[in-house]
């Protein structure tokens, strides 16, 4: 074998980074594989935009078939994103006996089971290190160095846009809308930021991490997802008063034959390592029965870090090919017959501490009515703050509860919000402060 040819479908930001890395560090890569890795063909609908890279004549095409049907191409890199035509391209590559490397967390979070099964039948790899955490080597660690562990929890700050916004709100006391506008101007947020700020991107990623850690199949549609657009500077300030920071946290937990998988704003202690993950950085924390707690930290997006992760997967495939191996490891790290069936715990059944903020008239008996409704639903109060006394006007009342069941808390808030003393819908934020 004189070289290993790869084909790229999708020549956007990450695709450009992959091409640059192969061309820039080709000699280094060859010294670690044994033969050169050659980028033979790039398919994209736009082949006229100047991407700041010089490519050989004839490498670019608008026809993905030139990648998928080329018998010399052993590895297809899918970087177009989304569900279709990405899914069709990936399945066709597999059917043609080609290994697949992708950064498409949305595709795998929804259609992973079908894709993994197809790869198993054809004895080819599907690798996706770049789908979670950009350049942070978290997936290879789960499948490799930590494979002997039973995992109990996985927690992650997995979206740089949300983390940047919450960091600025925390440090400057700024409002959500103002920071979002700045993030868009700096290129940290898309013109339509819904995918990021409503937690969808993070939910795709935690679906993959939970599947990998717990050896089960979790799809995006099963993840409880709540974004950060409702977080106000008022909540940020009260969190600080209680010794917490607010982060968009992805949470996965296993309890016997049940699993939790959820994404939502979460208060975590300000002295906790995850609370110090600021700006556009990501972090993922695992707890294994033998390795204990382990945290990975780094840039979770961007051309260079993500391209680095893609090339890491390509090198892994290339080394297997040099050793005469087709598929060395199933995508989730478990033998196909060893995947567990775990039941997803509904959000109403989780137990947590809660931050509750009420906007109520400042008059005698208000706190008694609120605490009475909470007690009726088996919710006990740990601490309270009331600020801005103004008789006859509405003021914020903030309570921190002891651990309670979510459906009980929701029922209590539904009742309290009917009180004539309440002027705005009550606010709930979950607290994670007892992490293994």
Where would I find each of the regions flagged by the language model?
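Rossmann-like NAD(P)H-binding beta-loop-alpha module
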Residues: 120-201, 208
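Glycine-rich phosphate/pyrophosphate-binding beta-alpha loops
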Residues: 228, 292-294, 298-304
């Amino acid at each position: 074998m004189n070289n290993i040819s790869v084909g790229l479908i999708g020549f956007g930001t990450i695709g450009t980074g992959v091409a640059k890395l192969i061309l820039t560090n080709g000699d280094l890569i060859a010294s670690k594989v044994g033969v050169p890795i050659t980028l033979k063909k790039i398919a994209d609908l736009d082949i006229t935009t100047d991407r700041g890279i010089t490519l050989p004549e004839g490498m670019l095409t608008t026809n993905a078939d030139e990648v998928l049907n080329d018998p010399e191409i052993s590895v297809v890199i899918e970087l177009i994103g989304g569900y279709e035509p990405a899914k069709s391209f990936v399945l066709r590559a597999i059917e043609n006996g080609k290994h697949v490397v992708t950064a498409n967390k949305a595709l795998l979070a929804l259609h992973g089971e079908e894709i993994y099964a197809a790869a198993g039948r054809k004895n080819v790899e599907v690798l996706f290190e770049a789908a979670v955490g950009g350049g942070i080597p978290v997936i290879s660690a789960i499948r490799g160095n930590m494979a002997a562990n039973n995992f109990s929890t996985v927690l992650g700050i997995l979206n740089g846009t949300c983390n940047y916004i919450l960091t600025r709100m925390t440090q400057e006391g700024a409002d959500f809308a103002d920071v979002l506008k700045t993030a868009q101007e700096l290129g940290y947020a898309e013109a339509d930021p819904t995918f990021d700020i409503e937690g969808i991107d993070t939910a795709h990623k935690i679906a993959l991490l939970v599947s990998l850690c717990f050896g089960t199949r979790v799809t995006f549609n099963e993840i409880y997802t709540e974004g950060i657009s409702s977080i106000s500077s008022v909540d940020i300030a009260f969190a600080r008063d209680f010794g917490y920071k607010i982060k968009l946290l992805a949470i996965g937990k296993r309890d016997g034959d049940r699993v939790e998988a959820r994404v939502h704003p979460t208060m975590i202690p300000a002295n906790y390592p995850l609370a110090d993950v600021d700006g556009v950085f990501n972090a993922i924390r695992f707890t294994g029965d033998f390795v204990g707690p382990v945290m990975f930290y780094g840039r979770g997006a961007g051309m260079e870090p993500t391209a680095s992760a893609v090339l890491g997967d390509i090198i892994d495939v290339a080394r297997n090919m040099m050793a005469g191996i087709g598929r060395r490891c199933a995508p989730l790290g478990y033998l196909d017959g060893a995947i567990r069936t775990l039941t997803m715990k509904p959000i109403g059944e989780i137990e947590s501490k809660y931050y509750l903020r009420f906007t109520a008239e400042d008059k005698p008996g208000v706190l008694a009515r609120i605490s009475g409704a909470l007690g009726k639903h088996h919710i006990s109060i740990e601490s309270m703050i009331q600020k801005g006394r103004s008789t006859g006007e509405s003021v914020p009342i903030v309570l921190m509860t002891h651990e309670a069941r979510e459906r009980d808390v929701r029922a209590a808030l539904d009742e309290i919000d009917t009180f004539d003393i309440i002027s705005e819908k009550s606010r709930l934020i979950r607290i994670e402060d007892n992490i293994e």
